[in-house]
Amino acid sequence: MSDLSGRTTVVAGASRGLGRGIARAFAEAGAPVVAVARTGPALAELATTSANIRTEVADAADATVAWSLLDRYEPEVLILVAGASPVMRPLQHQTRETFSVNWHTDVKIAFTWLGNALLKRGAQ
């Protein structure tokens, strides 16, 4: 990965899996990383892996969280991997309700964060 020194990066959904890996990779490349997730202990452990990682325990689906963190950190890079954990079963066994929880949560997070990021940029 190229040098990302000084390129503040917010990773929503950073406590595990892909989000955690992305946060670590960006921090190793020199980016100041703000790792956001609902899981405090997992974020605390992540922060011990790099001095470039600071954490925010918060729900990425909350619109006030998105606006507040975008305003506070003014990231150049925004990575959204937060979302609802899906009910794992074959599609033909999903109900509208089980499918909708994931879809609504994931779309809401993307819409909220990207909308706020674009509004903030447009206001400058």
Residue ranges and their predicted role:
Residues M1-V10:
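Flexible N-terminal pre-Rossmann segment of NAD(P)-dependent oxidoreductases
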Residues T8, S15-R16:
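Conserved glycine-rich cofactor-binding loop
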Residues A29-E45:
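Conserved glycine-rich Rossmann-like NAD(P)H-binding loop of the short-chain dehydrogenase/reductase
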Residues T49-A63:
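Rossmann-fold cofactor-recognition segment
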Residues A61-E74:
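Conserved Rossmann-fold cofactor-binding substructure of NAD(P)-dependent oxidoreductases
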Residues D71, T105-Q124:
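Amphipathic alpha-helical dimer-interface segment in Rossmann-like NAD(P)H-dependent oxidoreductases
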Residues V81-M88:
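Conserved NAD(P)H cofactor-binding loop of Rossmann-fold oxidoreductase domains
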Residues Q92-T112:
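Catalytic Tyr-X3-Lys loop
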